[in-house]
Amino acid sequence: MTNTSRPVLNLDLDLLRTFVAVADLNTFAAAAVAVCRTQSAVSQQMQRLEQLIGKELFARHGRNKLLTEHGIQFLGYARKILQFNDEACASLMYSDIQGTLTIGASDDTADTILPFILQRVTNVFPKLSIAVSIKRSAEMTDMLQQGKIDLVITTSNNDDLPHVLLRTSPTLWYCSADYQYQPGETVSLVVLDEPSPFRALALDQLTAAGIPWKISYVASTLSAVRAAVKAGLGITVRSVEMMSPELRVLGEEEGLPKLPDTRYYLCRNPDHDNELTNAIFSAIESGTRSHLLPVSTGTESELREPPTDESLKDIT
């Protein structure tokens, strides 16, 4: 029996898509670019959405659009609605596509970003077989350009390759929980062997800040880097995805420079196009605009404490 005293609202998907863009990008101007509308059109859409649901979604503080308590609550539902809508449409479009997709990923995405992508792909393409290759980012990019893999998740943004930004994550200085570092002393670094973007970043940032450094341990795998840092052999630089209870974060309080965010991309090679790869890439690209992999957030001080097992679930 229908309760006529509370009419059911039919939410406009365009309004939801714009709302999620504003929530993720924090300004109407940035969201307008993302959804291909004018800034005034985005503002009008958000007014319509607030009128429709009868709640204020944004706090009125300057240009940055911070979510109210109702806005935060509504954002989770908006993402789910868009996800189900997009997956339903995509599954009907691509349900008959068969074949094998080869995805390449680096160590630091293998247990964080990769599972999310695999879930998305299998939901939309149920008849698809997937092969995964885990190697260093530079090697993955070479394999992609050689046509040995179809898609790659990497931190390297090659403008010559079509790519989708999957996530932006804080980049942090890590040491073991009981590691002692005094501001001004030589930084002992634990790094991957070259080529490594995080190694290069650490050296460049310390050199630019005039902080003395030395390489105390060189590893060939990320697991070896983790082990060396946990053993107290030195400090390393990685994105927030590496955080674990055995590690702690160093930063500006210890005199270390603030690091630029890490961006994770999904790339394909236009010289090795095929229907399968193009369909999957397009499905993921459309998904990231509305509900996939929201930006990892948090101030340095908030990220200093080791996360609980429960909080780590939010990363994936």
Swiss-Prot record:
<dbReference type="InterPro" id="IPR000847">
    <property type="entry name" value="Tscrpt_reg_HTH_LysR"/>
</dbReference>
<dbReference type="GO" id="GO:0003677">
    <property type="term" value="F:DNA binding"/>
</dbReference>
<dbReference type="InterPro" id="IPR036388">
    <property type="entry name" value="WH-like_DNA-bd_sf"/>
</dbReference>
<dbReference type="InterPro" id="IPR005119">
    <property type="entry name" value="LysR_subst-bd"/>
</dbReference>
<keyword id="KW-0805">Transcription regulation</keyword>
<dbReference type="GO" id="GO:0003700">
    <property type="term" value="F:DNA-binding transcription factor activity"/>
</dbReference>
<comment type="similarity">
    <text>Belongs to the LysR transcriptional regulatory family.</text>
</comment>
<feature type="domain" description="HTH lysR-type">
    <location>
        <begin position="11"/>
        <end position="68"/>
    </location>
</feature>
<feature type="compositionally biased region" description="Basic and acidic residues">
    <location>
        <begin position="301"/>
        <end position="316"/>
    </location>
</feature>
<feature type="region of interest" description="Disordered">
    <location>
        <begin position="293"/>
        <end position="316"/>
    </location>
</feature>
<dbReference type="InterPro" id="IPR050176">
    <property type="entry name" value="LTTR"/>
</dbReference>
<dbReference type="Pfam" id="PF00126">
    <property type="entry name" value="HTH_1"/>
</dbReference>
<dbReference type="Pfam" id="PF03466">
    <property type="entry name" value="LysR_substrate"/>
</dbReference>
<keyword id="KW-0804">Transcription</keyword>
<feature type="DNA-binding region" description="H-T-H motif">
    <location>
        <begin position="28"/>
        <end position="47"/>
    </location>
</feature>
<protein>
    <recommendedName>
        <fullName>HTH-type transcriptional regulator PecT</fullName>
    </recommendedName>
</protein>
<comment type="function">
    <text>Regulates pectinase gene expression.</text>
</comment>
<dbReference type="InterPro" id="IPR036390">
    <property type="entry name" value="WH_DNA-bd_sf"/>
</dbReference>
<keyword id="KW-0238">DNA-binding</keyword>
